Design a protein with these regions (language model features):
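A metal-dependent hydrolase signature that marks the N-terminal structural subdomain at the beginning
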Residues: 1-64
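Second-shell loop/turn segments in exported
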Residues: 7-13, 79-83, 115-117
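Active-site recognition of the HExxH zinc-binding catalytic motif
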Residues: 25, 91-105, 125, 129
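Short pre-active-site segment immediately N-terminal to the catalytic Zn-binding motif
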Residues: 73-93, 119-120
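Active-site catalytic microenvironments for nucleophilic, acid-base chemistry
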Residues: 100, 104, 134-138, 172
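Post-HExxH zinc-binding segment in Zn-dependent metallohydrolases
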Residues: 113-154
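Long, well-structured alpha-helical subdomains associated
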Residues: 138-191
Length: 191
């Protein structure tokens, strides 16, 4: 498929995608984001600067960060790279919305005490990867979900290690309906 045909390019498209993701998360996981979230469409350079990284473009497609969830006091925002394919943008939104949900529902100090500071990122990122990949399966986007699952399983970072840990407790449902529990159901002990 030609990625540019499905690219999300306008603020209006991003807002619609956010609304779709919010409805899906409520339908699939029974969760709602109950605060206003500012959605910003940014270029890759600005997105990476917000992460404290430098963006170095390459001539070929590369796996890179497409979004970030930001909490500043009681304000929440999601920055998304513009021009990404629709399904990639949707999965990134679900990932970042999972972080917003975590900010709103988890006692971060209790999570750190329970799992240790060294596992904190695995707890957060593992759940967000689980959520985005499971969402793609539930949407019937099996090829995209399977690709993301395989790539994430072999990653040797907090995303991959965390995702594999979540799979142990919350196996993927490969159909278009959930067949078991989700990490959204246990706010004190998600893993």
């Amino acid at each position: 498929m030609n990625c540019s045909r499905t690219a999300v390019k306008t603020e209006a498209e991003f807002r619609k995608l956010y609304q779709d993701a919010a409805r899906g998360m409520e339908l699939f996981y029974g969760v709602r984001i109950t605060v206003p979230v500012k959605i910003q469409m940014v270029n890759a350079k600005r997105l990476h600067r917000s992460l404290g990284k430098t963006f170095v473009p390459t001539a070929k497609p590369d796996g890179r960060t497409l979004g970030v969830a930001i909490k500043r006091g009681n304000d929440y925002a999601i920055l998304l790279e513009n021009g990404s394919p629709r399904m990639s943008s949707l999965m990134t939104l679900v990932h970042e919305m999972t972080h917003i949900w975590q900010y709103l529902n988890w006692d971060m100090d209790a999570i750190r005490r329970k799992y240790g500071a060294e596992m904190e990122l695995e707890i957060y990122e593992g759940m967000a990867k689980w959520s985005e990949i499971q969402y793609a399966y539930l949407m019937g986007e099996t090829a995209e979900a399977k690709r993301a699952e395989i790539c994430t399983r072999v990653r040797q970072d907090e995303y991959g290690r965390g995702f594999v840990k979540y799979l142990t407790r919350y196996p993927m449902s490969y159909a278009t309906h959930l067949e078991g529990a989700t990490p959204f159901e246990d706010k004190e002990t998600p893993l």
